[in-house]
Amino acid sequence: MWLIVGLGNPGGEYKLTRHNIGFMAVDFLMEGLGNPPIKNQFKAEIAQAKIKDHPVIFCKPQTYMNLSGESVQPLMGFYKIPLERLIVIHDEIDQPFAQMKIQKNRGHGGHNGIKSISGLMGSMDYTRLRLGVGRPANPNIPVPDYVLGKFTKEEFAQMPDFLNKAGDAVESIILDGIQKASTKFNT
């Protein structure tokens, strides 16, 4: 079984913000799998499905970004999911918009959701799908304001293709392994 975690913040005011692209990616993946039923457990919205006969649990922590590990750690323990079967999808300001990077065992890069998960798991040895949201064009815009801001109209126009590519990357990680997936999808 695999655990696919999309990071974001709960609540309508955050729904279409850059910081919630992890939630958006999980929603897109679940939609492609027929929208499996969602349960509220482990301080998260979770759903079970299969990706090409591989059982997966989708998770959207409802704890706010900085406490995401409070959902991930107990969920992994309950289902006995090993760290090598954890994929965390999150926003990445150091990647240009619509680019992505698959990495394993890397630092948190200042991302508070990753800090929370790594801190509670006691390890960074899990796969991350870093979805590029870019940096603010105006250097006077603070990063927190930028990531909590909504995507531009131009970015929204590219979103279906970007999320489809993210879904393909998750499938490739599961079916082909991180090395092949990284070679194919890292931009």
Swiss-Prot record:
<keyword id="KW-0963">Cytoplasm</keyword>
<feature type="binding site">
    <location>
        <position position="64"/>
    </location>
    <ligand>
        <name>tRNA</name>
    </ligand>
</feature>
<feature type="binding site">
    <location>
        <position position="14"/>
    </location>
    <ligand>
        <name>tRNA</name>
    </ligand>
</feature>
<dbReference type="GO" id="GO:0005737">
    <property type="term" value="C:cytoplasm"/>
</dbReference>
<dbReference type="Pfam" id="PF01195">
    <property type="entry name" value="Pept_tRNA_hydro"/>
</dbReference>
<dbReference type="GO" id="GO:0072344">
    <property type="term" value="P:rescue of stalled ribosome"/>
</dbReference>
<comment type="function">
    <text>Catalyzes the release of premature peptidyl moieties from peptidyl-tRNA molecules trapped in stalled 50S ribosomal subunits, and thus maintains levels of free tRNAs and 50S ribosomes.</text>
</comment>
<feature type="binding site">
    <location>
        <position position="66"/>
    </location>
    <ligand>
        <name>tRNA</name>
    </ligand>
</feature>
<comment type="subunit">
    <text>Monomer.</text>
</comment>
<dbReference type="InterPro" id="IPR018171">
    <property type="entry name" value="Pept_tRNA_hydro_CS"/>
</dbReference>
<comment type="similarity">
    <text>Belongs to the PTH family.</text>
</comment>
<dbReference type="GO" id="GO:0000049">
    <property type="term" value="F:tRNA binding"/>
</dbReference>
<feature type="active site" description="Proton acceptor">
    <location>
        <position position="19"/>
    </location>
</feature>
<protein>
    <recommendedName>
        <fullName>Peptidyl-tRNA hydrolase</fullName>
        <ecNumber>3.1.1.29</ecNumber>
    </recommendedName>
</protein>
<dbReference type="GO" id="GO:0006515">
    <property type="term" value="P:protein quality control for misfolded or incompletely synthesized proteins"/>
</dbReference>
<dbReference type="InterPro" id="IPR036416">
    <property type="entry name" value="Pept_tRNA_hydro_sf"/>
</dbReference>
<comment type="function">
    <text>Hydrolyzes ribosome-free peptidyl-tRNAs (with 1 or more amino acids incorporated), which drop off the ribosome during protein synthesis, or as a result of ribosome stalling.</text>
</comment>
<feature type="binding site">
    <location>
        <position position="112"/>
    </location>
    <ligand>
        <name>tRNA</name>
    </ligand>
</feature>
<dbReference type="InterPro" id="IPR001328">
    <property type="entry name" value="Pept_tRNA_hydro"/>
</dbReference>
<keyword id="KW-0820">tRNA-binding</keyword>
<feature type="site" description="Stabilizes the basic form of H active site to accept a proton">
    <location>
        <position position="91"/>
    </location>
</feature>
<feature type="site" description="Discriminates between blocked and unblocked aminoacyl-tRNA">
    <location>
        <position position="9"/>
    </location>
</feature>
<dbReference type="GO" id="GO:0004045">
    <property type="term" value="F:peptidyl-tRNA hydrolase activity"/>
</dbReference>
<keyword id="KW-0694">RNA-binding</keyword>
<keyword id="KW-0378">Hydrolase</keyword>
